[in-house]
């Protein structure tokens, strides 16, 4: 269904874009997050937004598209769920 979850709670369900389905985009988002969660769930850095892209440290997590939440909404949601 393309839902990316953090600690069992929905983080994002990416919208489909012309070049990729929402499910495909969710695999990329999950892969970008895996870098942090493979180390465990403690001390995950906060997300921030640069030029409309959600980052954790220097890792781009997601570039929102039409139909997605805004980058700031996603960063805020991530920061609530990351703990």
Regions found by a protein language model. Name each.
Residues 1-83:
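N-terminal targeting peptides and non-cytosolic leader segments immediately upstream
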């Amino acid at each position: 269904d393309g839902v990316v979850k953090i600690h069992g709670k929905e983080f994002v369900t990416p919208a489909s874009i012309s070049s990729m389905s929402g499910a495909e985009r969710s695999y990329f988002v999950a892969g970008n997050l895996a870098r942090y969660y493979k180390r465990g769930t403690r001390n995950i850095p906060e997300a921030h937004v640069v030029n409309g892209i959600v980052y954790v440290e220097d890792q781009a997590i997601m570039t929102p598209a039409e139909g997605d939440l805004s980058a700031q909404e996603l960063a805020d949601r991530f920061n609530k769920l990351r703990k």
